Amino acid sequence: EKNPLYWDADRVRLNEIRYFPVSNESTEDRMFRAGQLHVTNVVPLEKCPIYIENGNPNLRIEPYMGTYFYRINTLHPILKNKDIRLALAFAINRKQIVEKVSKCGQAAAYSFTPPGSAGYEPDTDVPFNPELARSLLADSGYENGDGFPVLEILFNTSEGHRKIALAIQQMWQ
C-alpha cells in the first residue's frame, strides 16, 4: 500500500503494488495476456519469435547486460584437466543457441563480460570449433568420447534454462 508517511506522498499516484511470484514462464505469460498482471519481464522462449513476427505491441526488447555461464567443478577428477574444459567450451555453438534456442535477439557472448559493454569487445580464443574439441578429448584419452564419464549440469527451474542446457548437452555428445 501507499505509504502516507512518504515525504512526497501526494505526488505518488499508485495506491498499491501487488507482486505475484510465478514459477512457470508460460503461466506468467498467460496471466499477463489475460490482464491479471500489468507488468512482466518474462517471455517464454517459444513465444518470443512469434511476438516479434506479429509485432506484439507489448513486447519490448531492450539491451540487457548479462551473460549465461556454467561454473565448472575443477575439483572433479575429469574436469581438473584444462584441455577437457577447453574441449567442452569449443564444443558449444553460442551463435546457434541465441539463433535457434533463445531466439529473442540476444548476442552470443564469448567471455564473462557481455558484448557491447561500454564499447568493450573482448577477443576470444574459444570459438565454436568441434574438430578442435574432439582433438583435445582424444589427446586426453577420450577418442570419439569413448569412456568419457557422464557429467551433470545444474540449472534453475526456468524452462528457457532447461532448453539451453539440453542444447549444450546435445553439442557435448
Question: Which residues does each predicted region cover?
Answer:
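Extracytoplasmic
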Residues: 12-14, 54, 65-67, 108, ...
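Periplasmic-binding protein-like
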Residues: 61-72, 116
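Append "and occasionally in soluble cytosolic enzymes with long acidic Gly/Pro-rich linkers
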Residues: 2, 60, 80-170
